Structure formats: C-alpha cells, structure tokens
Curated annotation (Swiss-Prot):
This is Transcription initiation factor IIA subunit 2. PANTHER family: TRANSCRIPTION INITIATION FACTOR IIA SUBUNIT 2 (PTHR10966). Ubiquitous. Keywords: Nucleus, Transcription, Transcription regulation. GO terms for biological process: RNA polymerase II preinitiation complex assembly; transcription by RNA polymerase II; transcription initiation at RNA polymerase II promoter. One of its GO terms (cellular component) is heterochromatin. It comes from the Eukaryota. Its main location: nucleus. Belongs to the TFIIA subunit 2 family. It is found in: Nucleus. TFIIA is a heterodimer of the large unprocessed subunit 1 and a small subunit gamma. It was originally believed to be a heterotrimer of an alpha (p30), a beta (p20) and a gamma (p14) subunit. Forms a complex with Moonshiner/CG12721 and Trf2. TFIIA is a component of the transcription machinery of RNA polymerase II and plays an important role in transcriptional activation. TFIIA in a complex with TBP mediates transcriptional activity. Part of a rhi-dependent transcription machinery that enables the generation of piRNA precursors from heterochromatin while maintaining the suppression of transposon-encoded promoters and enhancers.
Length: 106
C-alpha cells in the first residue's frame, strides 16, 4: 500500500470531493471510489519519484520537535530558508513528513 500523504494536497482534496459527489448522485460505488484513491496514491508517488528533478536545499534556525514512528519522520522547523538555484524563500514554520522511499510501497 502506498503512502496517502498527497491526499491532503489541492489535487487530492479535489479528487476526493469529486468522488464524494459521484457517490452522492449514485454514479459510482464507494468501493470504486476507494480503488480510485488507492490508484491516485500509487500514481502520485510514482510520478514524484520519476519525474521531479528539481533540487532544493534548506537551512533551519531551529529544530522545534521531531518524531519517528512507523518508518515516518516528522520534523517541525522554525525560521527556515529554502534555496533553489536563483531563488531564496524564508518562512517562519515548516512541517516536514518524510517516508522511507525504499520500503517497496511505491
């Protein structure tokens, strides 16, 4: 089973809302909607793994909290600076959720 992290993105939320509407109007079954979401999880993880080539570095002023549970790291950072080739972005708070990409779940 793939990670479901991307269901809370704009794309994932829109997909879920559309599926809920189709279920409400009787156009698809809840089982089919569930299968669509599982396929979305697999596809988005594969696409990000294979197609995204951009690199970004970041530096945090402070690591506020960290947690490791079920092969998932959660980091809460303060005063973070992200750098791409020609662009720098500074933010007050960032939450990073990092999953094991080698676990065979993709």
């Amino acid at each position: 089973m793939s990670y479901q992290l991307y269901r809370n993105t704009t794309l994932g939320n829109t997909l879920q809302e559309s599926l809920d509407e189709l279920i409400q109007y009787g156009q698809i079954t809840p089982g089919l909607a569930f299968k669509v979401l599982l396929q979305f999880d697999k596809s988005i993880n594969n696409a990000l793994n294979q197609r995204v080539k951009a690199r970004v570095t970041f530096k945090a002023g402070k690591l506020n909290t960290y947690r490791f549970c079920d092969n998932v790291w959660t980091l809460m950072l303060n005063d973070v600076e992200f750098r791409e080739v020609h662009e720098i972005v500074k933010v007050d708070k960032v939450k990073i959720v990092a999953c094991d990409g080698k676990s065979g779940e993709f």
